[in-house]
Amino acid sequence: VKNVFYVIIDAFCYNNLERKIGDEYTTPFLRELANGNICAKKMYSQAPYTEASLVALLSGENTLDNGGYLFGNRSTQKTVFKSFKEKGYKVIGQYSPYVYSKAYLRDIDQYFYTRLVSIQVVFDYRLSYYKSRYEKSIITSNEIRVCTEILEEEFETWIGQAESLLQKDDTCILIQDWQSIDTIKKVLEGLKKEKELFDENPTTYLYNIFEEFDSHNLLYLNRMYNNKRVIENSVYLENKYQEQFEVLQKKYTGIIRKDSPDFKYLLNILKNNRSGFRDFKGLVHNYMRYYGNNFLGEYLKSINNNTQTEVCMKKQFKHAIKAVNSANAAGMPGMVYLHVQDFHLPTAIHSSDYEDINYIENEIEEALCLGNKIDRGYKGNIIADLSARYCDNKIRGFYNDLVNNFGNDFKLIITADHGYPSYFNPPRSVIYNQTFVEAFHIPFIMCDGENNYSIDSISSSMDHFSIINNSDNWKSKRKYVLSEYAGPGCPDISDKAIWYTYIDNEYRVSVELKLCENISYDKLKGVYNIIYDKDEKNNLVKKAPNIVEVKTIMDIIQKRHNELKHKFENEKFLKSFFVEK
């Protein structure tokens, strides 16, 4: 039985494998793996955003089943982690507590933190939605219950991590020096006082959060807890490389500003889109951001603000190999799940928390060397492409370390939770909540020299390991992808519109529906023929009634919508959270 390593790259599009700077591919190693191993060129992720995809990957559940993916992982009966455990594997994973429910850990044997808890994200992406409902006096008792459950888990996780840091627990080994002992003690004392107030009356405490929000004491404690120390060598690096970054920024700015805005696209949005003027303003704004960015010029100056939010990939990979070696020594194969975010913006092009300054200098110098190859034909976001090269190099190093440690006794799976457009290339009216095809078109690479059959979905890797066979939840051959999304954190679907996005090889159709509604042409938000309109600029929504394929697609979406309605109305779990008004 071979050791298994899953590397899930956050926001990794398939087209990253084909991007170039000058005559050089930005991800040469990943491209080599994709061409030399099992690779799915038509892979679509099941859902476009992190948690949704994670639940789908681990459990095979449809995204919004079981009350939205905030609770989906908690309620699913069997995860992939559990399946590997039953096969005798020791399951090892990293934990990013500011994103995932602690239920994520329940079938993991050994985990390690890769970042400090941040409740700011909970305020921004969970509680802000309910705050607006509270202010309108329309928040329901079930929604209050959801919020108090979120807070209860946040207290448990945050207090637990702070105590583990003080105890120098193995789960905190990679973030042990990210905060001083005195600060952790002060924050822990404050947290315990807040927890006492919460326990006295959770609803009253929640209302206080809604009313105070940005000035609430939890966010004060959060700022203290996440106050990043000045990164070692940052001043040295700025003094050595700042001028070179500014020269490259000037060259890049000159190249992108030679392109005029796409006036046809601007007019098309203004004429055809039902939210035309708003989206027109959004597109103009994003053009200004595209032409006016200063990513490279500010990169080194902002190291202390934008980095050290997560342990660098090299440290995570090194720790994972060590954990698997320990499992092997105890007579067990290891299964590792790593969700790395280095591809995301704002991101890094060097391992800022690594100790070896020579190693860091080599990373920066390679980035500058690649960046200087941009020419007049270059389009895109240079920092995103340099980040892609950084990520590619880390995975190359990881692969070599796997070979050195395990020989052929391992399998490496590389995929993504979702793709993402190259920022502002092309500039688009909507970046956030986007449903463009590249958000779904992700690579799937499995390094396995013993089997040479093609794979077209994440679930097929489960078939490969004989983990799950012939399950209705695991479709190996998809003719289309249907994603469902209900907003950041997807807190519940009782009174929120669900965004459905259907994609096949010809059309991308997006619809916005509440559970109480049925699909109709006026609910369509986007209809694009992606054969002839690869950049998805020509919205055919007004012509939809005359497109035969769209009616078929609408029927598929309505069928899924009916399933959610049925589950919402009948399942005990959902009733307990979301039915009461």
Which residues does each predicted region cover?
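Catalytic domains that recognize anionic headgroups
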Residues: V1-K581
